[in-house]
Amino acid sequence: MSLSTIIVIVASAFWLMILYHVVLTIAGLIHRAQTSPPETSAQYPSVDILIPAHNEGGVLFHTLDAMSKIQYPGKLEVYLLNDNSTDNTSDIAQYYADRLANIYHIKVPAGSPKGKARVLNYGVSISAGDLVVVYDADNQPNPDAVKLLVEKTLENDRNAGAVGTVRTINMQKNSLTRMIGLEFMVFQLLMQSGRWLLFRLGTYTGTNMLVRRSVLAEIGGWDEHALAEDTELSMRIVSRGFVIPVVPSSITYEQEPETLGVWIRQRSRWLRGNLYTISKLVKDPDLRHGQNLLNIVQMLTIYYAFMALLLFSDVWFVLGLLGILQIHFTIPLLILWFETVWIYAAQIVAATVSERQASFTNILFGVLMYFTYSQLWIYLVIKEYFFQLTHHVQNVEPVWDKTPRF
């Protein structure tokens, strides 16, 4: 097989994935435009909000203040699940618990494995509401966020719950937080709204999410060994025939990493957790059917094929600039490479428009992200491949790594 043929095959595969994401972008925009407020309910079921917290003193005042302002017509109880904090998390949690009748400060017993999933399972065991809502300890949801999730859940018995939108509260802090905020907008437009419109597929994002208690009981709660417990939970829920509708109007704001080191730690944990979920999906025949087949293909595409093609495109670009690779078809291959960059940037522009965050600065950062932020993912994925390989050989249990706050 000639070099030209190989390049054509690789370029075609890359462009097929780009085309798929273009379709998701259009579908996401249509979903956002079509989305109407959920129907109000005659009777609102009881809701328990679970907030896992470990050393969250720096952000907890804002979080619990936002929880105190949530407007919900039914019974609402908030459980601050204090996971052995050593800072002033306990003082802040107790301050609110002493003053508000529906906020509870729960001290979670020490246990193993450490992490969010174990704390959430404990929270489910000490609460009794019909619906369980999860927020991270740095979140500030809009007052109507929970109500919107509940109303969407109640529209259909197949709805396991619902998932809302996450926005970056510190997006203007620096270049990194701006790029993270833009990344979140694109993810929620394509992978949430776009996939929901086309395939009726939604994925929990770990916060601003609702799940029926009955569904949790049916699937056995959260997998306490999963570092990406939200994705893993979504896969098991989908395997049971449930769906997770996406509610763009239910909005929460959260803090994102402000330094590269913290970002790498956070995303390494996410990648590790998602690779664990891929392994579980591939190995478990009970999960490997129905709409989860699409989830498997998509996750394999993102974490294996797309990363390989992104690396290939970088090599292709450099060789083209240096004049080492000069293969021309109808259009020079370097021109096609530039077109992929503009399509990438166009998706970010579409996401900012849908979130009413369009600006010259965001468009400029959208272009720069391809050459900077996106390339960091190559390093992260390769790093985590080696991590998974060495820890599998040594039979080492993965360890939860909490994201520091600012």
Model-derived regions, located:
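Catalytic donor-sugar/metal-binding loop of nucleotide-sugar-dependent glycosyltransferases
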Residues: 234-252
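N-terminal signal-anchor transmembrane helix
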Residues: 24-75
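Membrane-embedded multi-pass helical conduit in multi-pass membrane proteins
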Residues: 6, 26, 30, 39-41, ...
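Short aromatic/hydrophobic "clamp" motif used to bind/position activated sugar donors
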Residues: 132
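Cell-envelope/extracellular polymer assembly enzymes that use nucleotide-activated donors
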Residues: 45-48, 77, 217, 232
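Acidic donor-binding segment of Leloir-type glycosyltransferases
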Residues: 65-109
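Long helical/loop segments within the catalytic core of UDP-sugar-dependent glycosyltransferases
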Residues: 101-109, 113-119, 123, 129, ...
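Catalytic core of nucleotide-sugar-dependent glycosyltransferases
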Residues: 183-188, 264-285, 345-350, 380-386
